[in-house]
Amino acid sequence: IGTSPIFMRFAETTPTSTAFWRIALAIPLLILWQMYDLKKNKGQVFVFKNIKDFQPFLLVGFFFAADLIMWHWAVNLTTVANATLLANMSVIFTAVGGFLFFGDRFSKTFIIGLTLALLGAVSLMGHSIEFNPENIFGDLLGLTAAIAYAGYMIASVAARKKFSTASVMLGTAIISAIFIFPVAIFETGLFIPSTLIEWWPLIGLAWFTHVVGQSLIVYALAHLPAALGAVGLLIQPVVAGGFAWYLFAEAL
């Protein structure tokens, strides 16, 4: 998922339209995956015994939609490094949420490791991190996206307790698209690409970043505490910063 801000920079659609297409173009592949999952494992999708079974899906979809909207705008209003690093502060909010909602306990080793990981991510980004007053709104959006992503991680853990990775990914995509679509229409109208040059960054976002990258995250959340999974995502700003340095000549 470290490639996400790179594809977004290449996208010629508006930020929210980019977020919508990231989800919409992923849905066909996720449907195929769900069909395969049902056939192979005889699992079930969207079979809710009560409203409580539906709540995690609704929360996952809402938080992911909020994260995508704010994150896509942040990348366009500040540097790739700033947006990525601030968004990955979600690890802190995820740890707090894990403690409050799941009773997760963290050892001194984990806390020290988390601190070192955060400091390491900041130091590896080096001078690419810029605190420019002109970018303050974009920086705030990046931080707000971190809070939304923490909500997504915590809700995903709850959803994965009952449903497969394929089911959570498909359910999240459908609900997120429902939330994002009216926002895109309200802003500037949904931008529909007309050339391959306009389509390829969106396809990359949908198929590589979302279907592959996001699915691996959701899969891992069934086997790891939310906070520990979030710590692993701190490699994302390093990857994004490296690509931004190479492709966009952003300082590193």
Regions found by a protein language model. Name each.
Residues 1-21, 30-33, 59-62, 70, ...:
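Glycine-/small-residue-enriched transmembrane alpha-helix faces in small-molecule transporters
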Residues 2, 6, 31, 61, ...:
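Hydrophobic/small/kink-forming positions within alpha-helical transmembrane segments
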Residues 3-13, 18, 25, 69-78, ...:
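Juxtamembrane C-cap of transmembrane helices in multi-pass membrane transport proteins
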Residues 23, 34, 38, 127, ...:
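C-terminal-most transmembrane helix of multi-pass membrane proteins
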Residues 34, 97, 106-127, 145-146, ...:
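Hydrophobic transmembrane alpha-helices of multi-pass small-molecule transport proteins
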Residues 44-70, 137-145, 192-212:
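Loop-to-transmembrane-helix transition segments
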